[in-house]
């Protein structure tokens, strides 16, 4: 096979081909007893609810760069894939489908609903697998897990039973966040507060057996049907005499006690508050302190129950309207005020949360949190990158509360508890039904009847076991012994407590170790305006569309390059009108630049591999050889150091600069004349091949498919081998720094190019002469040594060099490179007068346009009425026009003088 590249790189052919190659040859599947120090991590399991979004693309590409780097550094690298069963999210999707069919899950029944859920999971999981492969992730698919599969279920049941036996899991009636849409409890972290314009209603409650009354203020008048008390501050002189007496509840006529409680703010509102213990967290605490009855008004679907009297069966918001209307009609509505307040919404269900008194399972994590805090404070385990997120982690652990682990759903790990029929809530916890009956018969007699708990565990319960259950726990597997604890956990800041802290607590409890050494926190991908992407805003960008348009490597490189620092957000450049991204297009052009340079090298290697060419003789290296090897060494050492401390974006930008500027624009161009001469051809070939090989290896973590495609052709013929397991260049065997004289040559060439642009001489036109002058003998010697390179790169025929510039030269454009004067004679090269006229006209046009724009921006009416974005754009445009005008004015002055 000829070792040449097609004229253009086709990512859509190369990417799936190399992904299959890597998996077929198990490059990502390390043997537990294989060589190398282990480096392991788990993929944050995406929910089986559809497709990946741009946030996933960033979150997964960043650790893949690290994984590929560590693999090339000789580590026994294992990256474990998997998916999350996502109880609430799957219920939301499937119940929406059922509503479109005019049904509910209760119409369908548990078994039929679960059949649908498993079918959905299979389809969604296949989609996600395909997308993860499409991203080029180096995951070990032979070790894939699912949070609800049989192995994980066995682990979850064991953990639940063990924690219950330790007294850490218990059952109780508590106020929970209830989502009427999903009909389940949700954690505090799954609640979003939204600021809304509402009302504050003032209601009059008569004091029993007197002419007095109390006025209470509320944002939820419908809950007055569940009031069991009115609270006042015990030292409030307005109400102190009423403490211990009763008030009459309108509508229902129930008598409720007036209590004194120091939690009441006597300065807020009227200083008297209605107490609804079953539907408000603060009232719940007041109710407990004073032994008030707790009356639940709510059905699971958000309608009111029989405790609401005439409003039973009505939706909560309908009840609100009817209660307010009745209060107004009967005269106990004192007033209504506009009121802006935060309303808690269910993150998944998208509806206002209801505080709801319910029997739930809880996990006391206080002891676990204490041990995890000790490890963090005394040993910095785990270490956070960036370090500031460690404070967030610590704050969550300090402020921890009992974890409500039960959910009133069907899809998930069913709670391994069985209730004793006919008892007052008696139950047994066991690994399976047979064990449950054995325990129950011993405890309650041979005729005992059991009913399995209908609830499932919070999805985060099984996810919190992910680092060790994916390696086989509770079995003591070889993988668990070798790859646990994980070296790295890469995830988003928004789930530091949801997931990271809980994994640490569970791992500490069941393995005695913190489950990961380092936690890398990535930022968000924001849209082109800097806004957070969300389904609600409709401003998401599909990573698959970007990969379809530009290729996977271009998207990967863009996402990582744009990370200015660990944990920083990425603003994604995107034109919604055209569906194009300038940033990803730039990365595609970068890939094409690499392809074209590699194609040139391969075309000039005479079918020889780097091994066949051999290493270049150090004594025969030219200045440009020594320079490119020095720059390669600098770059390799820098990238190795940056990747070692997770500065992934900075490393990507360093590599871009080396490849685009140093290798392609300078060295390849300088190698061209040497390749044409027989006596210099082999030396140029040797250095080109060696530099290309190492450059491809440096590139591999970011652009795995492109680098593999070129590397395979560079090294043909090969047995089964891959760039992904080649040594990562560290640069320790290369020069410490490039020769300084090369930098002077670069400055001179850049100055010649700038003068050419100023004189508007076409880039490909050869300049008859450029005059150089320097009083510095070392500079003149360096120029002499690089004169041929300067002439070649600057496209100059003659390069006279003088110690002192001729002051009598006319019509010369002058520039400076270091202390070297660079003079471009313009006579005969361009029409100086015409050039001056052209510059003058351009300057006049620019001054006119900027004047119009400046006047607009000085107009107060425009600034007050124009969209803020347009004003910002106009100011930026004016600044750009003024900068261009300054450059034109300087050029014109130089030309006229």
UniProtKB/Swiss-Prot annotation:
InterPro entries assigned: aa-tRNA-synth_I_CS (IPR001412), aa-tRNA-synth_Ia (IPR002300), Anticodon_Ia_Val (IPR033705), M/V/L/I-tRNA-synth_anticd-bd (IPR013155), Rossmann-like_a/b/a_fold (IPR014729), tRNA-bd_arm (IPR010978), tRNAsynth_Ia_anticodon-bd (IPR009080), Val-tRNA_synth_C_sf (IPR037118)
Pfam families xrefs: Anticodon_1 (PF08264), tRNA-synt_1 (PF00133), Val_tRNA-synt_C (PF10458)
Record-linked SUPFAM superfamilies: Anticodon-binding domain of a subclass of class I aminoacyl-tRNA synthetases, Nucleotidylyl transferase, tRNA-binding arm, ValRS/IleRS/LeuRS editing domain
Residues that, per the record, bind ATP: 535
GO cellular component, one term: cytosol
Keyword Transcription in record: no
Gene3D superfamilies documented for this protein: HUPs (3.40.50.620), Isoleucyl-tRNA Synthetase, Domain 1 (1.10.730.10), Valyl-tRNA synthetase, C-terminal domain (1.10.287.380), Valyl/Leucyl/Isoleucyl-tRNA synthetase, editing domain (3.90.740.10)
Matches recorded under NCBIfam families: PRK05729.1, valS
Protein name listed in UniProt: Valine--tRNA ligase
Organism: Gloeobacter violaceus (strain ATCC 29082 / PCC 7421)
Protein encoded by which gene: valS
């Amino acid at each position: 096979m000829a070792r040449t590249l097609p004229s253009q790189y086709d990512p859509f052919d190369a990417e799936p081909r190399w992904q299959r190659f890597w998996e077929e040859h198990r490059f990502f599947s390390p043997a537990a007893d294989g060589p190398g120090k282990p480096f392991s991590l788990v993929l944050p399991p995406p929910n089986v609810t559809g497709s990946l979004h741009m946030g996933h693309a960033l979150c997964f590409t960043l650790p893949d760069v690290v994984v590929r780097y560590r693999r090339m550094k000789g580590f026994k690298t294992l990256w474990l894939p998997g998916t999350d069963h996502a109880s609430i999210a799957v219920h939301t999707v499937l119940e929406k489908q059922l509503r479109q069919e005019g049904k509910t899950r209760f119409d369908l029944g548990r078994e039929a609903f679960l059949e649908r859920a498993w079918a959905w999971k299979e389809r969604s999981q296949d989609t996600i697998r395909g997308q993860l492969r499409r991203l080029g992730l180096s995951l070990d698919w032979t070790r894939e897990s699912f949070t609800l599969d049989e192995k994980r279920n066995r682990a979850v049941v064991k953990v639940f039973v063990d924690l219950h036996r330790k007294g850490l899991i218990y059952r109780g009636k508590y106020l929970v966040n209830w989502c009427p849409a999903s009909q389940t409890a949700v954690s505090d972290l799954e609640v979003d507060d939204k600021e809304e314009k509402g009302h504050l209603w003032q209601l009059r409650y008569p004091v029993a057996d007197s002419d007095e009354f109390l006025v209470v203020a509320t944002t939820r008048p419908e809950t007055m049907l569940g009031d069991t008390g009115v609270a006042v501050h015990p030292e409030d002189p307005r109400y102190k005499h009423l403490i211990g007496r009763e008030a009459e509840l309108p509508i229902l006529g129930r008598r409720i006690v007036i209590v004194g409680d120091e939690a009441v703010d006597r300065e807020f509102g009227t200083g008297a508050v209605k107490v609804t213990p079953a539907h408000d967290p603060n009232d719940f605490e007041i109710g407990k302190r004073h032994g008030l009855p707790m009356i639940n008004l709510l059905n699971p679907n958000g309608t009111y129950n029989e405790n609401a009297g005439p409003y039973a069966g009505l939706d909560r918001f309908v009840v609100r309207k009817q209660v307010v209307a009745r209060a107004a009609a009967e005269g106990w509505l004192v007033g209504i005020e506009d009121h802006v307040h935060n309303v808690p919404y269910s993150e998944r269900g998208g509806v206002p949360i209801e505080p709801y008194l319910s029997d739930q399972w809880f996990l006391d994590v206080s002891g676990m949190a204490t041990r995890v805090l000790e490890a963090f404070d005394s040993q910095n385990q785990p270490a956070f990158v960036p370090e500031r997120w460690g404070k967030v982690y610590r704050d969550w652990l300090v402020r921890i509360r009992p974890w409500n682990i039960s959910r009133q759903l069907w899809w998930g790990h069913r709670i391994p508890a069985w209730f004793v029929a006919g008892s007052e809530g008696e139950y047994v916890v066991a690994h399976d039904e047979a064990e449950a009956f054995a325990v129950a018969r011993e405890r309650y007699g041979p005729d005992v009847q059991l009913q399995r708990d209908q609830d499932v565990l919070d999805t985060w319960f099984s996810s919190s076991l992910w680092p060790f259950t994916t390696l086989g726990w509770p079995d003591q597997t070889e993988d668990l012994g070798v790859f646990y604890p994980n070296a790295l956990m890469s995830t988003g800041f928004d789930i530091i407590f949801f997931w990271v802290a809980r994994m640490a607590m569970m791992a500490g409890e069941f393995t005695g170790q913190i489950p990961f050494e380092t936690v890398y926190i990535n930022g968000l991908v924001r849209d082109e305006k800097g806004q957070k992407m969300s389904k609600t805003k409709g401003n998401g960008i599909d990573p698959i569309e970007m990969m379809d348009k530009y290729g996977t490597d271009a998207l990967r490189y863009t996402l990582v390059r744009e990370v200015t620092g660990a944990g920083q957000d990425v603003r994604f450049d995107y034109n919604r009108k055209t569906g194009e991204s300038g940033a990803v297009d730039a990365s595609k052009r970068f890939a094409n630049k690499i392809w074209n340079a590699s194609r040139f090298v391969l075309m000039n290697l005479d079918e020889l591999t780097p091994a066949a060419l051999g290493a270049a003789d150090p004594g025969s290296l030219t200045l440009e050889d020594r320079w490119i090897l020095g720059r390669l060494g600098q770059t390799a050492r820098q990238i190795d150091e940056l990747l070692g401390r997770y500065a992934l974006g900075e490393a990507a930008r360093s590599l871009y600069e080396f490849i685009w500027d140093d290798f392609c624009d300078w060295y390849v161009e300088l190698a061209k004349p040497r390749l044409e001469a027989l006596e210099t051809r082999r030396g140029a070939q040797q250095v080109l091949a060696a530099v290309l090989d190492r450059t491809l290896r440096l590139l591999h973590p970011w652009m795995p498919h492109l680098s593999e495609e070129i590397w395979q052709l560079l090294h043909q013929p090969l047995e089964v081998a891959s760039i992904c397991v080649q040594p990562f260049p560290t640069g320790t065997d290369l020069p410490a720094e490039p020769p300084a004289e090369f930098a002077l040559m670069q400055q001179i060439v850049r100055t010649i190019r700038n003068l050419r642009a100023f004189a508007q001489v076409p880039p490909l036109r050869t300049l008859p002469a450029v005059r150089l002058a320097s009083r510095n003998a070392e500079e003149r010697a360096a120029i002499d040594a690089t004169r041929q390179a300067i002439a070649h790169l600057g496209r100059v025929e003659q390069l006279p060099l003088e110690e002192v510039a001729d002051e009598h030269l006319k019509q010369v454009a002058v520039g400076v490179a270091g202390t070297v004067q660079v003079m471009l004679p313009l006579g005969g090269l361009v029409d100086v007068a015409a050039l001056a006229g052209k510059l003058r006209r351009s300057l006049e046009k620019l001054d006119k346009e900027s004047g119009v724009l400046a006047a607009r921006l000085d107009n107060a009416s425009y600034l007050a009425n124009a969209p803020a974005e347009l004003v910002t754009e106009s100011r930026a445009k004016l600044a750009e026009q003024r900068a261009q005008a300054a450059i034109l004015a300087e050029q014109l002055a130089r030309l006229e003088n």
